[in-house]
UniProtKB/Swiss-Prot annotation:
Function: Phospholipid transfer protein that preferentially selects lipid species containing a palmitoyl or stearoyl chain on the sn-1 and an unsaturated fatty acyl chain (18:1 or 18:2) on the sn-2 position. Able to transfer phosphatidylcholine (PC) and phosphatidyetanolamline (PE) between membranes. May play metabolic roles in sperm maturation or fertilization.
Organism (species): Mus musculus
Compartmental location: Cell projection, Cilium, Flagellum; Cytoplasm; Membrane
Gene Ontology MF, one: lipid binding
Modification N-acetylmethionine, positions: 1
START domain segment(s): 14-224
Source superkingdom: Eukaryota
Region described as Disordered: 1-23, 260-291
Phosphoserine sites (modified residues): 253, 259, 284, 289
Protein name: START domain-containing protein 10
């Protein structure tokens, strides 16, 4: 089996905001991401309840750029199960009720690929989509998955969706025992457009905690689901299983936010059904789709 490894290019960490060319993250990039996930200085705690905590970057509260960090303690979920759930694109379609469409496009290396993801936003905002370069790396008993936006010539922005930009988004999964772990989600995203304050507040106070809890429920049900759906197919662990075509990095370019259309939704008010249900998108907490 080919061993997934980070790029060994002899260069320093590339700041997410200053990235000018498409490159597969190296070991230093993974270490930098881990350090930011574990950092406390400069973050404001906005939510802490039932093992889930949410922070926002203090200096970004009133700007277009949104930076959020969520952490959840997962009892009865091994780190490797959570890692599988985040990778398994077919299972994500079952548990992620906000997803509109998601698919892998091409393989770059044994631990990097390019993919598409579109999702429902709280009504009446326009829905978003993104093309990202995703990379992953096991680090002992821990795991990191992270991504940033790229441009692919065959997948330009669509008229019915707003193309968002992931400056850097990812997960740090830390094992705390044979059947427990802690996951930290860190996102630095430009959703493209001037969003109303209620969206920013709702994301940190409700949508992010709800998404983490839904992920936890999905992890509990994953082993049973996977036994019925290609139990041995895990290309993120066994790259030789990947059916994806190979793609050269030269085919991609960095997706800069300033090159995309800016949508002003700052005056949009929350819909009546969103206020009543408190939902992000149209999904519910019904877990019947996970069977």
């Amino acid at each position: 089996m080919e061993k997934p490894a980070a790029s060994t290019e002899p260069q320093g960490s590339r700041p997410a905001l200053g990235r000018e060319s498409v490159q597969v993250p190296d070991d230093q990039d993974f270490r930098s991401f881990r350090s930011e996930c574990e950092a406390e200085v400069g973050w404001n705690l906005t939510y802490s309840k039932a093992g889930v905590s949410v922070w926002v970057q203090a200096v970004e509260m009133d700007r277009t750029l949104h930076k959020i960090k969520c952490r959840m303690e997962c009892c009865d979920v091994p780190a490797e199960t959570l890692y599988d759930v985040l990778h398994d694109i077919e299972y994500r379609k079952k548990w992620d009720s906000n997803v509109i469409e998601t698919f892998d496009i091409a393989r770059l290396t044994v631990n990097a690929d390019v993919g598409y993801y579109s999702w429902r936003c709280p009504k009446p905002l326009k829905n978003r989509d993104v093309i990202t370069l995703r990379s992953w790396l096991p680090m002992g008993a821990d795991y990191i998955i992270m991504n940033y936006s790229v441009k692919h010539p065959k997948y330009p922005p669509r008229k019915d969706l707003v193309r968002a930009v992931s400056i850097q988004t990812g997960y740090l999964i830390q094992s705390t025992g044979p059947k427990s772990c802690v996951i930290t989600y860190l996102a630095q995203v430009d959703p493209k457009g001037s969003l109303p304050k209620w969206v920013v507040n709702k994301s940190s106070q409700f949508l992010a905690p709800k998404a983490m809890k839904k992920m936890y429920k999905a992890c509990i049900k994953y082993p049973e689901w996977k036994q019925k759906h290609q139990p041995h197919f895990k290309p993120w662990l066994h790259p030789e299983q990947s059916p994806l075509p190979s793609l050269a990095l030269s085919e991609l370019s960095v997706q800069h936010a300033d090159s995309l259309e800016n949508i002003d939704e700052s005056a949009v008010t929350e819909s009546r059904e969103e206020r009543a249900g408190g939902a992000g998108g149209e999904g519910s907490d019904d877990d019947t789709s996970l069977t």
